[in-house]
Each structure stands twice: as C-alpha cells, then as structure tokens.
C-alpha cells in the first residue's frame, strides 16, 4: 500500500528535540515500511504544496496527522482520515478558540476520523455529528527498540515527570514531593510558578538522554489536566516504568494492572494523597519491571498498525466510508 502521512510542518521529521506528533509520525512511517508499505511524509504548512505532493505520489491512502488541516479533506481525491492530537479534545470548553477554528470544521466536513481513544470518538460522534461508520479507534504506538532497558534502575527511589513544563502538565503543583524529579523545557506559562532552581529539576533532556536514562527511574508521572493518548506513557512502559496518570491520561491503558495508577481529578490538589500514590506505584513497578516490559509489546507500532490502522485503511479504501 502507498500511504501519505501529513504532519504539522512546523518541526522537522524526525525531530531533533521535542515533538511528540513528529516522533509518532516518524516511528509510524518506519513501522509501515518494515511491514512492506511505501510511505510519503508531507511536512509543510503550504496547503498547495501538500495537495501537489499528494497527487504526485498518488497514494492508496492519506492520513492527516494534524487536525488544523482537516480543511484540506474535501480537496484530497484519495481515501483519507484525520487524527487529532489536541490535549483538550474531550474538554472543548477549555479549547482557547479550538472549537471554532478546528472542531467546527469536523462537524461541517464529517471526515473519516482515526481517533486516539474511545472518549475522543464519542466527542466526534456526539458533538460533531460524525456517523459511527466514519469513526475508527487507532491508538498510538511506540518504537520499542529506541529505549535502553534495565532491571536494576540507578534511581529506583525516584519518579520522573517527563514533559514540557507548562500549564496543562501542572508540574508546579507537585514540586514539594521530594522523590519526584522533573525533565522538560519550561514554557512561559510556567515561569514564576515552577521553581527551576530546584535540585529536582533536571533541565531539558536531549533525545539521547531520554532514550538512555528513562529506564533508570522507578516510574513515570503525568498529571495533566488534558491529554489525548500521550506518547510518553508508552515510552515509559517500553523502558520498564509503571505510570501514574490523571483520568485524562489513561486512554488505552489496562487499568487492571497494579503498575498503572490513575489519580482522580477531584484529588489532584491533595498532595499527600498524590505522593503516597506515586510511591506505592513506584514500589509495585520496581517489582514488576519484567511484566511491564512484556506489556509494552502491546504498543509496538507494527502490532498497533496491523491490528488497527491497516484494516481500517482497507475498509475505507474499499468504499465503506470514503
């Protein structure tokens, strides 16, 4: 199959630094190639260039991985689907203009949607009026070979909060937790709130640091007030770490597993409760590292693509909902 993937166009693919969507696109493209498919990555902000590149490649399927470009959907003459990675897609009242700029376009165009979670698909069904036959669950995957793995972590007594430090991730709420360490670039929205002089702030990790050092921590913490299907959780699992997330970060995780902990939103300001939950999860995670590494295989990109993306692409190509 010949597949075109459209990226945001603002950061190179693969990215040199941070860029979750760009990493996802790159790793997905490499897995597709390993499965025998031809892949074109289009990464430009010029809509005319996008359409021209698609037509030149003449793909069997087009996957728009940046929801702002849903407006191009009617102009793409090939079977197509759109994915949103917007962190507040399930909380449109917090959208900051997203609803009018992007979501209402979905309601008008009613494209095929590759949604990252069941909750996201429900939003498109109930609020955008997109028919169920146009909605497909397609979780993100991860490249399992990227991360170093150890059964004896150097910092097993520490938890790592690995994310851009901003208002959505809320890191400043948890800085008094002594065993919680933070890595990520600081967004202006957190300046004055997040104490970057703290010994627990590790600065912004390079890709090499991320791939080499993540496995040396006991577990991952991600307590955002909005997420879609966060890549960092799968990266943590692939490095052998359990995860502590909010209700917004639990998409596609097996909540029956002891090393996956969900903090209820109504308890997010109870720092003592959060700290105890993080420590308890860390202790369980250290005892279950082999099991975590085995579970992470469920998110291997080749497995995810074969189970979800390729069958749904074929259904759309066959005319079920073009």
How would you label these PLM feature ranges?
Residues 95-113:
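Membrane-proximal helix-turn-helix segments that form the acceptor-binding/catalytic region
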Residues 242-246, 252:
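Short hydrophobic beta-strand element within catalytic cores of glycosyltransferases
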Residues 168, 265, 269-273, 282-318:
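A charged, aromatic-enriched C-terminal amphipathic alpha-helix characteristic of glycosyltransferases
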Residues 114, 151-181:
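Conserved donor-binding/catalytic core segment of Leloir-type glycosyltransferases
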Residues 225:
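Aromatic "clamp/platform" in nucleotide-sugar-dependent glycosyltransferases that forms part
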Residues 92-94, 125, 139-157:
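Acidic anion/phosphate-binding donor-loop and adjacent secondary structure
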Residues 108-134, 142:
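A short, active-site helix/loop in glycosyltransferases that binds the activated sugar's phosphate group
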């Amino acid at each position: 199959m010949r597949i075109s993937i459209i990226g945001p166009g603002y950061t190179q693919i693969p990215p040199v630094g941070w860029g979750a969507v760009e990493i996802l696109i790159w790793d997905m493209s490499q897995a597709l190639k390993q499965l025998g498919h031809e892949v074109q990555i289009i990464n430009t902000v010029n809509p005319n260039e996008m359409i021209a590149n698609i037509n030149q490649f003449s793909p069997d399927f087009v996957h728009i991985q940046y929801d702002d470009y849903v407006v191009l959907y009617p102009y793409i003459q090939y079977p197509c689907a759109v994915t949103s990675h917007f962190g507040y897609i399930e909380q449109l009242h917090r959208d900051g203009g997203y609803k009018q700029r992007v979501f209402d376009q979905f309601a008008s165009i009613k494209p095929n949607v590759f949604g990252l979670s069941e909750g996201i698909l429900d939003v498109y069904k109930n609020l955008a009026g997109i028919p169920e036959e146009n909605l497909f669950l397609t979780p993100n995957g991860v490249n399992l070979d990227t991360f170093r793995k150890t059964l004896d972590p150097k910092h097993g007594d520490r938890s790592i909060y690995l994310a851009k430090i901003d208002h959505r991730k809320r890191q400043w709420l948890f800085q008094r937790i002594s065993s919680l360490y933070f890595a990520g670039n600081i967004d202006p929205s957190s300046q004055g709130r997040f104490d970057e002089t703290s010994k627990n702030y590790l600065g912004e990790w390079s890709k090499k640091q991320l791939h080499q050092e993540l496995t040396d921590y006991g577990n991952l913490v991600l307590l955002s007030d909005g997420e879609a299907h966060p890549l960092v959780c799968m990266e943590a699992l692939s490095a052998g770490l359990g995860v502590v997330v909010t209700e917004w970060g639990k998409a596609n995780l097996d909540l029956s597993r002891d090393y996956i902990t969900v903090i209820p939103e109504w308890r997010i300001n109870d720092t003592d409760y959060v700290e105890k939950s993080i420590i308890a999860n860390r202790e369980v995670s250290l005892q279950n590292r082999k099991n975590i590494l085995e579970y992470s295989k469920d998110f291997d990109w080749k497995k995810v693509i074969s189970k979800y993306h390729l069958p749904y692409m074929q259904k759309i190509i066959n005319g079920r909902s073009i």
